[in-house]
Amino acid sequence: MEIGITYNSFARKKMLPEERELKATSLAIGKHLRKLGHHVHYFDMDNPDDIKALCQAKIEVAFDTCERIHDDPRGEAYTAALLEFLDIPHTRTSSFQIALGVNKVRAKLLLAYNHILIPRFQVFQNEEEELHPDLPFPLFVKGVACENSIGIDELSLVTNPQELKAQVHKINTLYNQPALVEEFIPGREFSVAILPGKTNAILPIMEIEFDDLPPHKRFLDYNAKWITHSDQYKRTVPIYPVNLTIEEQKTISETALKCFNIFGLHSYARVDMRYNDHTPYVLEINQNPSINETGSGYVHSCENHGLNYTEMIEALLENAAQRHQ
C-alpha cells in the first residue's frame, strides 16, 4: 500500500527531548512499514509544500504522528481533520475526539458526567483567585492544555497557599494558559493501554513504581518522562506483571475501557489512573500515547501482550484501513 506518514520535522538547531522522540518515532514507523512491504511517503505538517503534496498524493492510509503545527498543539486535531477532508483513512482517532481531549478540563467534565471518579479540581485563571474550601492540600498543579508532562516538575505538588500561587503564576505566564489544580490522590499509579480492533483489547496493566522516591516526588514529571540521566527518570520504574488480585485487575481494566468508550475512541490510547483504597481515580486519557520503538509504555504493553513492534504497527494500520471500509 501507499502509506503517508504525517509528522513534525522540528527543523531547529536544538530540539527538546520529546521532539527528538517524536521524530524518531516517525522514522521507526516508516522503517517497519517498509519491512511489511509498503511504500512510505513523509509529509512534514510544518511545511506548506508538504501539505500541498499530501493533498495531491494518492495515499491509501495515513500513519498520523503529527502532534502540533508550528508549535501549536491544536495542529494535532487540524491534521486529522485535513486527512478526514481528503477522505484518507488514518491511524488516529477522529479530529473531533482529539480536540475534545486536548483540553483536560473538558475531558474531566465528560468523565465526571459519566460517573467516572476523578480527582476534584479547580481552574485558576490567575494566582489571586480563592481556593475552593473543598480542595485540601496537598494539590497538584498543571496546565489545562499542556502535553508530554510539559510544565510538571518537582514543585508541581504544592502543600500551602504560597506554593500554590507560585505554581499557578508559572503556568499562567510561562505557558499562557489557565492552571488546572486538582487534589493529589495518594496510592499506586497504573497505566492501561488499549489496542483497537473489532474487539478492543485491554493490554496488560502497567504499574509505575515510585517506592524509591520521597513521598513529595511520587509522580511522573517532565524529567521522569524525558530526561534519561535524571534521578527522577532512573527511579521511576514500570512494573510488569502487576501485583493485583483478579478482582482489582478487572476493576482497573473495566474503568479504562469505559473511558475509551465514553470518548468514542477507535484508535490506540492509554488511560492513566491512581488506585487508592480499592478505588480507581482516572487522571488522564491519552489519545496519542508515545509509540516510540524504545522506552514507550504502550509498546511495552503490546510486547507483554505478545506483539512485537512490527506486528503492533501492522495492527494499527489494519485497524485504520478497516474502519474506513
Where are the predicted features?
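A short glycine-rich, hydrophobically flanked beta-strand micro-motif that places a catalytic Asp/Glu
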Residues: M45, A179-E183, F190-S191, G264-H278
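Active-site nucleotide/adenylate-binding loops and adjacent lid/helix of ATP-dependent enzymes
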Residues: M1-Y7, C55-K58, A99-L180, I185-R188, ...
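A short beta-strand motif that forms the metal-chelation/ATP-contact edge
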Residues: I3, V61-F63, S191-P196, T279-E293
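Phosphate-binding site of ATP-dependent enzymes
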Residues: P161-E248, E254, Y281
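Hydrophobic beta-strand scaffold residues
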Residues: V40, P89-H90, I118, L139, ...
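ATP-dependent carboxylate activation and anion-phosphoryl transfer catalytic cores
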Residues: A112-H115, N243-Q325
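ATP-binding N-terminal substructure of ATP-dependent carboxylate-amine bond-forming enzymes
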Residues: M1-H90, F96, Q125-L131, H324-Q325
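Short beta-strand-to-turn element immediately C-terminal to the catalytic PLP-Schiff-base lysine
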Residues: F124, L155-N160, I194-G197, N276, ...
